[in-house]
A protein has these predicted regions:
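Short, glycine-/small- and polar/acidic-enriched structural segments
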Residues: 16-104, 108-112
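Pocket-lining segment of extracytoplasmic ligand-binding domains
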Residues: 137-231
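Bilobed "Venus flytrap"/periplasmic-binding protein-like clamshell domains
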Residues: 5-30, 88-154, 161, 262-265
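Hydrophobic residues within well-ordered alpha-helices
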Residues: 50-52, 148-150, 271
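General small-molecule cofactor/ligand-binding pocket signal
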Residues: 38-42, 132-136, 285
Length: 287
């Protein structure tokens, strides 16, 4: 939903309203009163497309989106959606052990290209299997989409709120937290999303970028201090217990320190070697 109004728009900002962004999003709604900043809420893949098409000036996008079009963007320092170890909301749910998925059909969520690339790296590089992939979005109650109901789906990639719902069900015997696997293999956190700014906006309005970055960092700090009340607001959406929501959000990380930048570089190096993104994805460029 866009908060459209009569004020001249000085910045078009894309935000994800999943549970994992609640500490930022809920505090932004409460604290930031800038009608000249137009907020668009959407899943990561929609924000990816909008930023690419110049329908946004900056926003939370999949890490993969920056790497795919490095000539278009720069990153805001100190901001990400990351996890060190289990993330709790990016899973491969499978009826078989991952080693048994070669030639089997795996449904990939079309909500995040970063998670799609990560699960392919994990299956193909770490488990040495080549499944058959198809794309689709699970229903809110974790059921297969219409396009997949006639297929023999053996595993599904689920992210965000969908994954939080599905991890509590018994539909799949194997529940592989992709961030946890990544950390075991690389020793690094995983950076799922970044704040990317279009190059022309960097040139046009650096002052607005600085103000927006300040508010983002402020909201994240306020949100982390107020997790209990935020969980009271957002836990019923899944639904999940407030304590489970609190534990989940405590595991989310929103900074982009040196270790996370290293993790981003390792991920981008995989993508470059796999031919998914251009070599210009490295080194990472910042505002």
């Amino acid at each position: 939903m866009d908060n459209l109004d009569q004020n001249p728009v000085t910045a078009r900002i894309g935000m994800v309203n999943f549970i994992n962004t609640a500490p930022l999003y809920e505090k932004w709604q409460q604290l930031v009163k800038r009608p000249d900043w137009r907020i668009t809420e959407a899943p990561p893949t929609t924000l990816n497309r909008m930023l690419y098409n110049n329908e946004l000036d900056l926003g939370f996008v999949s890490s993969h989106e920056y790497a795919a079009h490095p000539h278009l963007y720069r990153l805001l320092r100190g901001l990400s959606i990351s996890a060190t170890g289990p993330v709790g909301s990016v899973f491969l749910f499978s009826k078989k052990d991952p080693e048994m998925l070669s030639g089997k059909t795996v449904l990939l969520s079309s909500l995040s290209q970063t998670s799609v690339s990560l699960v392919k790296i994990i299956l193909e590089e770490y488990y040495q299997v080549i499944p058959n992939y198809m794309s689709g979005i699970l229903t809110l109650d974790g059921k297969l989409p219409q396009c997949a109901q006639e297929k023999d789906i053996q595993a599904v990639l689920a992210i965000g709120d969908n994954a939080l719902r599905l991890r509590e069900s018994d539909l799949y015997t194997v529940k592989l937290d992709l961030s946890e696997v990544w950390q075991k293999k690389t020793g690094l956190p995983f950076v799922f999303a970044v704040w990317a700014v279009r190059e022309e906006f960097c040139q046009k309005d650096p002052d607005s970028i600085s103000q927006i970055q300040h508010q983002l960092l402020r909201c994240i700090e306020e949100g982390k201090r107020d997790l209990q009340s935020i969980c009271q607001i957002v836990a019923p959406r899944i639904p999940m217990k407030e304590k489970d929501c609190f534990d989940y959000l405590c595991g989310m990380e929103y900074d982009l320190d040196a270790n996370k930048l290293k993790a981003l570089e390792v991920f981008f190096d995989y993508l470059i070697k796999r031919g998914e993104v251009p070599a210009e994805a490295l080194p990472v460029k910042f505002v």
